[in-house]
Protein backbone atom coordinates (compact mmCIF):
# COMPACT_ATOMS: atom_id res chain seq x y z
CA UNK A 1 0.00 0.00 0.00
CA UNK A 2 1.41 3.37 -0.98
CA UNK A 3 1.42 6.50 1.12
CA UNK A 4 -0.38 9.70 0.23
CA UNK A 5 0.93 11.07 -3.06
CA UNK A 6 3.56 8.37 -3.54
CA UNK A 7 2.29 7.06 -6.87
CA UNK A 8 -0.57 9.44 -7.48
CA UNK A 9 1.89 12.11 -8.66
CA UNK A 10 3.19 9.87 -11.46
CA UNK A 11 1.82 10.65 -14.92
CA UNK A 12 -1.10 8.53 -16.07
CA UNK A 13 -3.19 8.10 -19.16
CA UNK A 14 -6.27 8.47 -16.97
CA UNK A 15 -8.07 11.78 -16.58
CA UNK A 16 -6.13 13.97 -14.10
CA UNK A 17 -8.84 15.25 -11.77
CA UNK A 18 -6.33 17.50 -9.95
CA UNK A 19 -5.29 19.18 -13.23
CA UNK A 20 -8.86 19.41 -14.40
CA UNK A 21 -10.08 21.04 -11.18
CA UNK A 22 -7.14 23.33 -10.36
CA UNK A 23 -5.00 23.73 -13.45
CA UNK A 24 -2.16 21.96 -11.64
CA UNK A 25 -1.50 18.26 -11.52
CA UNK A 26 -0.77 16.72 -8.11
CA UNK A 27 3.02 16.88 -8.59
CA UNK A 28 2.80 20.57 -9.43
CA UNK A 29 0.65 21.16 -6.34
CA UNK A 30 3.26 19.48 -4.13
CA UNK A 31 6.05 21.54 -5.69
CA UNK A 32 4.25 24.90 -5.52
CA UNK A 33 2.23 24.80 -2.31
CA UNK A 34 3.56 22.05 -0.06
CA UNK A 35 7.28 22.32 0.69
CA UNK A 36 8.76 20.51 3.68
CA UNK A 37 8.62 22.73 6.75
CA UNK A 38 11.92 23.04 8.57
CA UNK A 39 11.05 23.58 12.23
CA UNK A 40 12.12 22.64 15.74
CA UNK A 41 9.95 20.30 17.82
CA UNK A 42 10.54 22.20 21.04
CA UNK A 43 9.93 25.61 19.52
CA UNK A 44 6.60 24.66 17.98
CA UNK A 45 5.42 22.47 20.86
CA UNK A 46 2.78 24.86 22.16
CA UNK A 47 1.33 25.30 18.66
CA UNK A 48 1.32 21.61 17.75
CA UNK A 49 0.83 19.95 21.16
CA UNK A 50 -1.33 22.58 22.85
CA UNK A 51 0.89 23.28 25.87
CA UNK A 52 4.49 23.99 26.77
CA UNK A 53 5.18 20.46 27.97
CA UNK A 54 8.43 21.26 29.75
CA UNK A 55 9.53 20.41 33.28
CA UNK A 56 13.31 20.15 32.98
CA UNK A 57 13.75 21.96 36.29
CA UNK A 58 12.87 21.26 39.89
CA UNK A 59 12.51 24.89 40.98
CA UNK A 60 10.61 26.60 38.16
CA UNK A 61 7.01 27.37 39.16
CA UNK A 62 4.99 24.14 39.13
CA UNK A 63 2.02 24.28 36.74
CA UNK A 64 0.92 20.62 36.36
CA UNK A 65 1.59 17.67 38.65
CA UNK A 66 0.91 13.95 38.18
CA UNK A 67 -0.63 12.14 41.16
CA UNK A 68 -2.15 8.70 41.65
CA UNK A 69 -5.21 8.10 43.80
CA UNK A 70 -4.92 4.98 45.99
CA UNK A 71 -7.35 2.32 44.79
CA UNK A 72 -8.32 -1.33 45.04
CA UNK A 73 -4.69 -2.40 44.80
CA UNK A 74 -4.35 -1.67 48.51
CA UNK A 75 -7.07 -4.22 49.27
CA UNK A 76 -4.68 -6.88 47.95
CA UNK A 77 -2.15 -6.25 50.72
CA UNK A 78 -2.12 -9.27 53.05
CA UNK A 79 -2.90 -11.69 50.23
CA UNK A 80 -0.17 -13.64 48.41
CA UNK A 81 1.68 -11.35 46.02
CA UNK A 82 0.98 -12.01 42.31
CA UNK A 83 4.74 -12.42 41.82
CA UNK A 84 7.13 -15.02 43.27
CA UNK A 85 7.41 -16.16 46.00
CA UNK A 86 3.68 -15.30 46.38
CA UNK A 87 4.16 -14.17 49.96
CA UNK A 88 1.29 -12.48 51.87
CA UNK A 89 3.51 -10.64 54.37
CA UNK A 90 3.65 -6.86 54.66
CA UNK A 91 7.35 -7.02 53.81
CA UNK A 92 6.60 -8.76 50.52
CA UNK A 93 4.29 -5.84 49.67
CA UNK A 94 6.92 -3.30 50.85
CA UNK A 95 4.44 -1.94 53.38
CA UNK A 96 4.76 -1.10 57.08
CA UNK A 97 1.02 -1.18 57.81
CA UNK A 98 -2.20 -2.81 56.65
CA UNK A 99 -3.68 -0.03 54.54
CA UNK A 100 -6.94 1.69 55.37
CA UNK A 101 -8.06 2.65 51.87
CA UNK A 102 -10.44 5.37 53.05
CA UNK A 103 -7.64 6.96 55.05
CA UNK A 104 -5.25 6.82 52.11
CA UNK A 105 -7.82 8.36 49.77
CA UNK A 106 -8.39 11.14 52.30
CA UNK A 107 -4.66 11.85 52.37
CA UNK A 108 -4.55 11.84 48.57
CA UNK A 109 -7.42 14.31 48.45
CA UNK A 110 -5.60 16.52 50.95
CA UNK A 111 -2.54 16.45 48.71
CA UNK A 112 -4.49 17.18 45.53
CA UNK A 113 -6.29 20.08 47.23
CA UNK A 114 -3.01 21.53 48.47
CA UNK A 115 -1.73 21.66 44.89
CA UNK A 116 -4.96 23.09 43.51
CA UNK A 117 -5.01 25.73 46.24
CA UNK A 118 -1.61 26.82 44.93
CA UNK A 119 -2.92 27.07 41.38
CA UNK A 120 -1.34 23.81 40.20
CA UNK A 121 -3.28 21.68 37.71
CA UNK A 122 -3.58 18.11 39.02
CA UNK A 123 -3.43 15.18 36.59
CA UNK A 124 -4.56 11.84 38.05
CA UNK A 125 -2.93 8.68 36.72
CA UNK A 126 -5.27 6.00 35.39
CA UNK A 127 -6.14 3.22 37.87
CA UNK A 128 -4.50 -0.18 38.19
CA UNK A 129 -6.35 -2.60 35.88
CA UNK A 130 -4.40 -5.74 36.79
CA UNK A 131 -6.34 -8.75 38.06
CA UNK A 132 -5.78 -8.70 40.94
CA UNK A 133 -4.65 -5.07 41.22
CA UNK A 134 -1.31 -4.78 43.00
CA UNK A 135 0.39 -1.46 42.20
CA UNK A 136 0.67 -0.25 45.80
CA UNK A 137 3.67 1.95 44.97
CA UNK A 138 2.05 3.69 42.01
CA UNK A 139 1.38 6.64 44.32
CA UNK A 140 5.05 7.52 43.68
CA UNK A 141 4.51 8.95 40.23
CA UNK A 142 7.89 10.66 40.02
CA UNK A 143 9.54 7.26 39.54
CA UNK A 144 7.73 6.10 36.40
CA UNK A 145 8.06 8.99 33.97
CA UNK A 146 10.51 11.83 34.01
CA UNK A 147 10.96 15.04 32.03
CA UNK A 148 13.35 15.20 29.13
CA UNK A 149 14.29 18.67 27.88
CA UNK A 150 10.69 18.68 26.69
CA UNK A 151 8.01 16.03 26.96
CA UNK A 152 8.26 12.95 29.17
CA UNK A 153 10.32 9.76 29.10
CA UNK A 154 8.64 6.54 30.25
CA UNK A 155 11.12 4.75 32.48
CA UNK A 156 11.42 1.01 33.16
CA UNK A 157 10.85 -0.13 36.71
CA UNK A 158 13.14 -2.39 38.74
CA UNK A 159 10.99 -4.91 40.58
CA UNK A 160 7.76 -6.89 40.48
CA UNK A 161 5.72 -4.58 42.70
CA UNK A 162 6.33 -1.69 40.27
CA UNK A 163 6.25 -3.47 36.94
CA UNK A 164 3.41 -2.45 34.58
CA UNK A 165 3.05 1.03 36.09
CA UNK A 166 4.52 2.19 32.79
CA UNK A 167 1.37 1.47 30.74
CA UNK A 168 -1.26 3.49 32.69
CA UNK A 169 1.28 6.30 33.07
CA UNK A 170 1.80 6.38 29.31
CA UNK A 171 -1.96 6.27 28.70
CA UNK A 172 -2.56 9.13 31.13
CA UNK A 173 0.01 11.34 29.44
CA UNK A 174 -1.27 10.49 25.97
CA UNK A 175 -4.85 11.30 26.93
CA UNK A 176 -3.97 14.89 27.86
CA UNK A 177 -1.70 15.33 24.84
CA UNK A 178 1.65 15.30 26.63
CA UNK A 179 4.31 14.08 24.19
CA UNK A 180 6.11 10.92 25.28
CA UNK A 181 9.48 11.46 23.63
CA UNK A 182 11.08 8.15 24.53
CA UNK A 183 10.99 4.96 26.57
CA UNK A 184 13.62 2.84 28.25
CA UNK A 185 13.73 -0.42 26.29
CA UNK A 186 15.61 -3.72 26.10
CA UNK A 187 16.83 -4.86 29.49
CA UNK A 188 17.60 -1.28 30.51
CA UNK A 189 16.26 -0.04 33.85
CA UNK A 190 15.82 3.43 35.27
CA UNK A 191 13.61 4.90 37.97
CA UNK A 192 12.95 8.56 38.57
CA UNK A 193 14.02 8.98 42.18
CA UNK A 194 17.72 9.54 41.48
CA UNK A 195 17.19 11.26 38.12
CA UNK A 196 17.36 14.93 38.94
CA UNK A 197 17.41 18.13 36.94
CA UNK A 198 19.70 20.51 38.84
CA UNK A 199 18.88 23.20 36.28
CA UNK A 200 17.83 23.13 32.62
CA UNK A 201 21.36 22.26 31.48
CA UNK A 202 22.48 19.82 34.17
CA UNK A 203 20.94 16.49 35.18
CA UNK A 204 22.23 13.65 37.35
CA UNK A 205 21.29 9.98 36.96
CA UNK A 206 22.08 7.10 39.31
CA UNK A 207 20.66 3.86 40.69
CA UNK A 208 17.48 4.42 42.70
CA UNK A 209 17.81 2.04 45.62
CA UNK A 210 20.51 -0.65 45.35
CA UNK A 211 19.24 -4.18 46.02
CA UNK A 212 20.95 -7.41 47.02
CA UNK A 213 21.58 -8.19 43.35
CA UNK A 214 22.43 -4.69 42.09
CA UNK A 215 26.14 -5.53 42.15
CA UNK A 216 25.71 -8.48 39.79
CA UNK A 217 27.38 -7.62 36.47
CA UNK A 218 24.27 -8.23 34.35
CA UNK A 219 22.14 -6.00 36.58
CA UNK A 220 24.84 -3.32 36.67
CA UNK A 221 24.96 -3.29 32.88
CA UNK A 222 21.16 -3.14 32.65
CA UNK A 223 21.12 -0.12 34.95
CA UNK A 224 23.84 1.57 32.91
CA UNK A 225 21.98 0.77 29.68
CA UNK A 226 18.84 2.43 31.04
CA UNK A 227 20.77 5.49 32.17
CA UNK A 228 22.53 5.79 28.81
CA UNK A 229 19.18 5.64 27.01
CA UNK A 230 17.83 8.45 29.19
CA UNK A 231 20.94 10.51 28.49
CA UNK A 232 20.71 9.94 24.72
CA UNK A 233 17.08 11.04 24.58
CA UNK A 234 17.88 14.23 26.51
CA UNK A 235 20.96 15.05 24.44
CA UNK A 236 19.16 14.43 21.16
CA UNK A 237 16.82 17.24 22.21
CA UNK A 238 19.48 19.52 23.66
CA UNK A 239 23.15 18.60 23.09
CA UNK A 240 24.19 21.28 25.59
CA UNK A 241 22.73 19.39 28.56
CA UNK A 242 25.42 17.90 30.78
CA UNK A 243 24.13 14.50 31.90
CA UNK A 244 26.12 13.07 34.80
CA UNK A 245 25.84 9.28 35.07
CA UNK A 246 26.74 8.67 38.71
CA UNK A 247 27.88 5.34 40.16
CA UNK A 248 25.22 3.75 42.33
CA UNK A 249 26.29 0.36 43.55
CA UNK A 250 26.69 1.04 47.25
CA UNK A 251 25.43 4.09 49.08
CA UNK A 252 22.57 5.94 47.44
CA UNK A 253 23.38 9.31 45.97
CA UNK A 254 22.19 12.00 48.37
CA UNK A 255 20.00 13.55 45.69
CA UNK A 256 20.36 17.34 45.63
CA UNK A 257 17.16 17.67 43.61
CA UNK A 258 15.32 16.38 46.71
CA UNK A 259 16.82 19.16 48.84
CA UNK A 260 16.31 22.20 46.61
CA UNK A 261 14.77 25.47 47.71
CA UNK A 262 15.89 27.73 44.86
CA UNK A 263 18.02 27.86 41.74
CA UNK A 264 21.38 26.22 42.47
CA UNK A 265 20.58 26.15 46.18
CA UNK A 266 19.94 23.12 48.39
CA UNK A 267 19.65 22.39 52.10
CA UNK A 268 22.54 19.93 52.34
CA UNK A 269 25.82 19.28 54.02
CA UNK A 270 28.13 18.76 51.04
CA UNK A 271 30.22 16.35 53.13
CA UNK A 272 27.39 13.82 52.69
CA UNK A 273 27.88 13.83 48.90
CA UNK A 274 30.60 12.48 46.66
CA UNK A 275 33.36 15.12 46.73
CA UNK A 276 33.80 14.98 42.96
CA UNK A 277 30.08 15.59 42.48
CA UNK A 278 30.26 18.56 44.85
CA UNK A 279 33.27 19.97 42.99
CA UNK A 280 31.40 19.66 39.68
CA UNK A 281 28.28 21.35 41.07
CA UNK A 282 30.31 24.26 42.41
CA UNK A 283 32.42 24.65 39.28
CA UNK A 284 29.54 24.31 36.82
CA UNK A 285 26.75 26.09 38.68
CA UNK A 286 28.33 27.96 41.60
CA UNK A 287 26.13 25.77 43.81
CA UNK A 288 25.18 26.98 47.28
CA UNK A 289 24.89 24.36 50.01
CA UNK A 290 23.05 25.59 53.11
CA UNK A 291 23.87 23.48 56.17
CA UNK A 292 20.97 23.22 58.59
CA UNK A 293 21.51 23.26 62.37
CA UNK A 294 21.53 19.89 64.11
CA UNK A 295 18.20 20.46 65.86
CA UNK A 296 16.27 20.39 62.57
CA UNK A 297 18.33 17.68 60.86
CA UNK A 298 17.24 14.09 60.28
CA UNK A 299 19.56 11.17 60.97
CA UNK A 300 19.94 8.38 58.39
CA UNK A 301 21.76 5.07 58.56
CA UNK A 302 23.51 4.66 55.20
CA UNK A 303 24.86 1.09 55.49
CA UNK A 304 28.10 2.49 54.10
CA UNK A 305 30.99 1.58 56.38
CA UNK A 306 32.80 4.76 55.41
CA UNK A 307 29.96 6.89 56.77
CA UNK A 308 27.41 4.81 58.65
CA UNK A 309 25.30 7.72 59.85
CA UNK A 310 24.62 11.01 58.09
CA UNK A 311 22.56 14.01 59.04
CA UNK A 312 20.39 15.62 56.42
CA UNK A 313 18.59 18.89 56.60
CA UNK A 314 14.82 19.23 56.91
CA UNK A 315 12.70 17.93 54.09
CA UNK A 316 12.09 20.53 51.39
CA UNK A 317 9.45 18.39 49.70
CA UNK A 318 8.21 19.75 46.37
CA UNK A 319 9.34 23.20 45.27
CA UNK A 320 6.18 25.04 44.17
CA UNK A 321 8.23 28.01 43.00
CA UNK A 322 11.59 29.44 44.07
CA UNK A 323 11.73 29.73 47.87
CA UNK A 324 8.29 28.14 48.32
CA UNK A 325 7.91 24.45 49.20
CA UNK A 326 5.15 21.93 49.92
CA UNK A 327 5.98 19.55 52.79
CA UNK A 328 4.10 17.10 55.03
CA UNK A 329 2.88 18.37 58.38
CA UNK A 330 4.61 17.41 61.60
CA UNK A 331 7.94 19.25 61.67
CA UNK A 332 7.28 22.65 63.32
CA UNK A 333 10.95 23.28 64.15
CA UNK A 334 11.98 22.61 60.58
CA UNK A 335 9.24 24.87 59.27
CA UNK A 336 10.32 27.70 61.56
CA UNK A 337 13.95 27.34 60.49
CA UNK A 338 13.08 27.26 56.78
CA UNK A 339 10.98 30.38 57.21
CA UNK A 340 13.91 32.04 59.00
CA UNK A 341 16.04 31.69 55.86
CA UNK A 342 13.32 33.09 53.60
CA UNK A 343 11.51 29.94 52.48
CA UNK A 344 7.70 29.97 52.42
CA UNK A 345 6.38 26.64 53.68
CA UNK A 346 3.02 25.12 52.73
CA UNK A 347 2.06 22.05 54.77
CA UNK A 348 -0.28 19.17 53.93
CA UNK A 349 -1.48 16.27 56.08
CA UNK A 350 -0.82 13.03 54.16
CA UNK A 351 0.87 10.57 56.57
CA UNK A 352 -0.20 7.33 54.86
CA UNK A 353 1.46 8.37 51.59
CA UNK A 354 4.90 9.31 52.92
CA UNK A 355 7.55 8.23 55.40
CA UNK A 356 7.82 7.09 58.07
CA UNK A 357 4.55 5.19 57.48
CA UNK A 358 5.22 4.56 53.80
CA UNK A 359 8.31 4.04 51.67
CA UNK A 360 8.45 7.29 49.70
CA UNK A 361 8.45 11.03 50.17
CA UNK A 362 6.12 13.81 49.07
CA UNK A 363 8.61 14.50 46.28
CA UNK A 364 8.30 10.88 45.12
CA UNK A 365 4.51 11.31 44.99
CA UNK A 366 4.69 14.27 42.58
CA UNK A 367 5.45 13.85 38.90
CA UNK A 368 6.41 17.23 37.44
CA UNK A 369 4.64 17.52 34.08
CA UNK A 370 4.79 21.28 33.43
CA UNK A 371 6.99 23.87 35.12
CA UNK A 372 7.94 27.42 34.24
CA UNK A 373 11.58 28.07 33.31
CA UNK A 374 13.94 28.77 36.17
CA UNK A 375 14.68 32.40 37.01
CA UNK A 376 17.85 33.47 35.23
CA UNK A 377 18.37 36.79 37.00
CA UNK A 378 20.49 35.23 39.74
Show the residue positions of the predicted features.
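The feature marks the mature, well-folded catalytic cores of soluble enzymes
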Residues: 2-378
Amino acid sequence: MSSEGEFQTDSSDEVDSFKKSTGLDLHEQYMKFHPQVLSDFGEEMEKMWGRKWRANTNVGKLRMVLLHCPGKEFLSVGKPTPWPPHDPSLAAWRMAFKPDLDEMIRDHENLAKAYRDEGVEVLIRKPDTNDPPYQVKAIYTDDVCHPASYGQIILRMYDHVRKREELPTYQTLAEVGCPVVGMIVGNGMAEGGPIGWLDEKHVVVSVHYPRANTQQPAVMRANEFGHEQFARIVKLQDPEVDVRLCPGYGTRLGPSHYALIDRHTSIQDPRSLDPNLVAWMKAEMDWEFIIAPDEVCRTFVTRDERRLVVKRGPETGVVLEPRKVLVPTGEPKARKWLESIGVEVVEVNCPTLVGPMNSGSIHCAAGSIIRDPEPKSY
